[in-house]
């Protein structure tokens, strides 16, 4: 158990800096590089949890990011993990804090059985 730092260019096309390592949890906030989504799922240990939140279409009205390349389409996070992870929770909508934005939030678990949310 523990935490560490890894400095890596995740968008440069180089080798995946985490190799074959598996993690109990992967957390992503305010970041979207679509080619990484399958690798993030692959990085989960059995029973591991992915928590992902980033901006979605509609955020243009609140400011940046406003480029469609950096905004999730409706249901895009769900589709990215469908058939690979068990969905624990999903939200898509407007948040007021820390500043108004349109976001998608996903919590999903690796495994083929029911996810026991009381044991975490």
PLM features per residue range, with description:
Residues 60-75, 96-97:
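Acceptor-substrate binding/catalytic loop of class I
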